[in-house]
A protein has these predicted regions:
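Active-site mouth of glycoside hydrolases
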Residues: 50-60, 64-220
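Extracellular glycoside hydrolase catalytic/binding regions
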Residues: 174, 179-278, 306-308
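Short, flexible, basic/aromatic active-site loop/helix in glycosyltransferases
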Residues: 446-447, 461-479, 494
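Conserved donor NDP-sugar-binding/catalytic core segment of glycosyltransferases
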Residues: 427-458, 522, 528, 534
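Short, acidic, metal-binding catalytic loop of nucleotide-sugar glycosyltransferases
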Residues: 357-366
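Aromatic-rich peripheral "rim/lid" segments of glycoside hydrolase catalytic domains that contact
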Residues: 287-335
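A conserved acidic beta->alpha catalytic loop
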Residues: 358, 373-382, 419-422
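Short aromatic/hydrophobic "clamp" motif used to bind/position activated sugar donors
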Residues: 415
Length: 861
């Protein structure tokens, strides 16, 4: 059931007299009345998922305008009187933006738009010149043409943005290749920025070339025509993930009234516009203002997409769109649930003022703010008392317990948690609450974006790894939502006992998401439910934060060992999204599905998930490999053959440095310095943070015991060979139920228990550690009066342990033969350590299986 229908159902059921949600202002005059809009004077900016005029959010409520038949001089927009009348009528119907899709309009048109309070999106027609990349004969100076067009309207206050082009034909893009088209558009983007640095730049894409990666654009625009509301809603969610932290604008949507009828057009445009804004779009352009349309040297009469007829008489769709535009982003009356916003703080005086000021600007009808001061020693409490919020002061007990204190005090159906160094978008709660109204999710999160103006270090930290990210299973369902921006149904959060108090600094959000999903509940994600999140503004603070995250990882691994792999990293089922993600070496080539003859209507880019091998250089444990090679290089003083480790050491340092440089080169800064030296310095600092982050995490992980040689389970005497045993049970139970009981029993001991895949010949694996494990296979025979339960268990030794041990032993033997005692002893100790650790981990795993089966034999199952 589409989101729009679910929200409509909620509207019908809402109580009369509910307080309305405040919306971004929209002209709402009746048709024929003078325009109510204020003439545009300020330049626009893109901030996070939305567009702003100064500090005021602008929802683009637009229509396309043209193309029209040119006059004898080739001027398409020559009838000034008609333009004046059209723009006045647009403003009277709640339209605030006009898109000129194919030709650069004269400056006169922008002046008229400004008089009527309209913004204009102008097209630079890059698609008309792309063919010259194939055949350069008689090619014009494309850059000069673009510069001339930009100069004709640069700096105009009515300018919304420049569109580099509109729908480069899929066959041409396929001929040229993806990278060549991307480079072409990037270069034109740079040309526009050179002429108008403050102007916003986009490219109007469409589903057939969705695969183009254009991260440099200021906003993302797509033309999408779908007659199915379900498919439209699903595709919008996909486009939001492509847009990432940038605004998404529907640059064209519509329906042909000739084929479907004017009533069907009105109904379709109503749900298209409402669905787009409910999905978090920053704006919508309806195609088109009028049925008058001229293309390729002739009037187009086979289609009628206009809101008005060619003579400008209105269709039913015009009133439908006017009403939909007046009610963005949501219907004005919904049964909005009461929300309790909980802010937990400890010595947060530097940022909590911004946080509370942002909460006061929320456009939501029914919410309370609870601030839990977790033992602050600065003037945090004094700042909080200056705001109309509820303050609860406690001794310092840690973040998770502070969150639980807020939960106990909350009166809302929904509990929304916000960090004290973050502040929300005015419609933050609106988008999150709408998701709760339309789904059964237990929790909903949204993106967190670093604001501009926090300084060079904070800007670099925002582009470095280690920030709060979200993990998505699908375009709308999450596996993890970060703690700085997460909301819960209070009943669901109370049902799992709230947050685990052992997590004092970090990790509580990961734990609570896993516990909710363990209960069979789902997590949602809304791309427009965003908050602005200040990053650390000093290298020391960033280092300390990452150490804390490393310790939290170790604590989570102890509680959820089955969620981690052998080296100690989370095995996410979904994809990680967010800024500052470290680059990886991609061994698997990305593919584009073009369809037969390149005719697939939706052509997506498919990228394989990074493999363990390609991800190794960015892992904290890579530094242990580097340290081991450095140790061998030092031992070469005692035994010269170990000098071979020196080139390996140099080789091992190349991947992390290369990936750090690549990540810094790809970073886009919110306020890029103009001086060359400052730009280089900022990227060098970003690269240094990419290198430092895994090291800080490694330190935190090691301090908390998360080491590659860690052990799960209690050591106990157990055989190191295959063991078969059986027991008789007079109580019949299904085979899978006995396995589930064994799994739960062993996990209760705090060990890591994994299930075999569909192609494995074993049922469960008990991981003793990185060097040893044990596996079991269960069989159940049915007999009169009971069941015979058979179990076979055997140790499993990964190849890495014996290989490392044999390598060290061989080197130790060589050093001993050359009478290099120091090197021989050091290498021998390493070999012995791995051997003993493997034995210990295998016996611990076998002992765990034996204890669980003994309990099963006693009838505990």
């Amino acid at each position: 059931m589409p989101l729009l229908r679910r929200l409509l159902a909620a509207t019908v059921e809402s109580r009369a007299g509910r307080v309305l949600v405040s919306r971004s202002p929209a002209p709402r005059a009746a048709p024929g009345a003078p325009p109510l809009a204020t003439p545009a004077v300020a330049r626009l900016s893109a901030k996070g998922k939305f567009l702003f005029v100064g500090d005021e959010k602008l929802y683009v409520r637009g229509v396309t305008y043209g193309a029209f038949e040119p006059d004898g001089q080739g001027h398409e927009y020559h009838d000034v009187g008609k333009i004046e009348r059209d723009f006045a009528d647009m403003a009277a119907h709640g339209i605030n933006t006009v898109r000129i899709p194919h030709t650069m309009p004269p400056r006169t048109l922008l002046d008229i738009a400004q008089r009527h309070g309209l913004h204009v999106m102008v097209g630079l027609s890059a698609e008309q010149y792309v063919g010259y990349l194939i055949d350069r004969r008689n090619a014009p100076d494309i850059e000069a043409l673009i510069r001339g067009k930009v100069r004709s309207c640069a700096g105009h206050p009515a300018l919304l943005c420049y569109a580099l082009g509109n729908e480069i034909p899929a066959s041409v893009a396929r001929w040229l290749g993806t990278r060549r088209v991307e480079r072409y558009l990037r270069r034109l983007f740079q040309v526009v920025k050179e002429e108008d640095p403050e102007g916003l730049v986009t490219y109007v894409n469409y589903p057939t070339t969705e695969y183009l990666r254009l991260p440099f654009l200021d906003l993302v625009c797509f033309n999408v025509y779908l007659e199915s509301q379900d498919r439209f809603e699903a595709y919008l969610a996909r486009l939001q993930n492509i847009a990432a932290d940038r605004p998404l604008v529907m640059s064209e949507l519509g329906l042909d009234s000739l084929r479907h009828g004017e009533s069907a057009q009105a109904r379709s445009l109503d749900w298209q516009v409402r669905t787009a804004f409910a999905a978090g779009c920053a704006g919508v352009f309806v195609f088109s203002w009028t049925d008058e349309w001229y293309r390729h040297g002739q009037e187009v009469g086979e289609w009628a997409f206009g809101l008005t007829r060619a003579d400008r008489s209105p269709k039913a769709a015009l009133e439908a769109v006017r009403e939909a535009f007046a009610q963005v982003p949501f219907w004005p009356e919904l049964p909005w649930p009461r929300v309790s916003v909980v802010v937990c703080t400890h010595n947060g005086s530097r940022t909590i003022r911004d946080c509370l000021a942002g909460l006061q600007r929320l456009a939501y009808p029914d919410y309370e703010v609870i601030v839990v001061d977790d033992g602050s020693t600065d003037d945090t409490a004094a700042i909080v008392r200056q705001h109309p919020v509820r303050l609860i002061q406690t001794v310092n007990r840690g973040l998770a317990k502070a969150r639980n204190t807020g939960l106990e005090a909350a009166t809302g159906e929904i509990i929304a948690y916000l960090d004290d160094d973050a502040y929300p978008d005015p419609h933050w709660l609106t988008y999150l609450a709408a998701t709760f109204l339309s789904t059964a999710h237990a929790a909903v999160g949204g993106p967190n974006v670093a604001p501009a103006g926090d300084g060079a270090v904070a800007d670099c930290v925002a582009r470095a790894p280690g920030g709060p990210v979200h993990v998505l299973l699908t375009d709308r369902e999450a596996e993890h939502i970060p703690g700085c921006n997460m909301a819960f149904r209070k009943a669901r959060l109370e049902a799992i006992g709230g947050f685990d108090g052992q997590f004092r600094v970090a990790g509580d959000d990961v734990d609570v998401c896993w516990r909710l999903r363990e209960r069979g509940w789902t997590l949602g994600f809304h791309p427009a439910g965003m908050v602005w999140h200040h990053r650390r503004n000093s290298i020391r603070a960033y280092w300390k934060q990452q150490i804390g995250y490393g310790r939290a990882e170790a604590m989570l691994e102890r509680k959820w060992p089955e969620k981690y792999n052998g080296p100690g990293h989370v095995r996410w089922a979904g994809r990680i999204y967010g800024s500052g993600l470290p680059a990886v070496f991609s061994w698997g080539r990305s593919r584009v599905y073009h369809g037969i003859w390149g005719l697939a209507p939706y052509q997506s880019l498919y990228e394989p998930a990074p493999s363990l091998l390609s991800s190794l250089p960015r892992m904290p444990e890579w530094y242990l490999i580097v340290a081991s090679l450095a140790g061998l290089s030092l031992l070469s003083i005692a035994w010269s053959p170990l000098r071979l480790a020196l080139p390996l050491l140099l080789l091992a340092t190349v991947p992390p440095v290369a990936l750090a440089c690549l990540g810094a080169a790809r970073a886009r800064f919110s306020d890029e310095p103009r001086r060359w030296a400052a730009r280089v310095g900022r990227r060098l600092l970003t690269a240094a943070l990419h290198l430092a982050q895994p090291l800080a995490r490694l330190r935190g992980r090691l301090k908390e015991g998360l080491t590659p040689w860690r052990q799960h389970g209690t050591p106990a005497p157990a055989p190191l060979w295959s063991v078969t045993t059986s027991t008789w049970s007079e109580r019949w139970q299904a085979h899978e139920r006995r396995l589930a009981w064994l799994e739960a029993t062993m996990r209760a001991e705090g060990v890591c228990v994994l299930r075999g895949s569909g192609s494995d010949c074993w049922d469960l694996e008990v991981r003793g550690g990185f060097f040893g494990a044990a596996r079991l296979l269960l069989a159940v025979e049915d007999h009169p009066g009971g069941q015979l339960v058979r179990l076979r268990s055997w140790p499993d030794v990964p190849a890495r342990g014996p290989l490392f041990m044999l390598g060290c032993a061989a080197l130790a033997w060589g050093a001993a033969r050359d009478q290099a005692t120091l090197a021989a002893v050091a290498l021998g100790v390493c070999a012995l350590f791995v051997a003993l650790r493997g034995v210990e981990q295998c016996t611990a795993a076998m002992a765990t299986i034996r204890r669980a089966f003994r309990r099963l034999s006693k009838g505990d199952c």
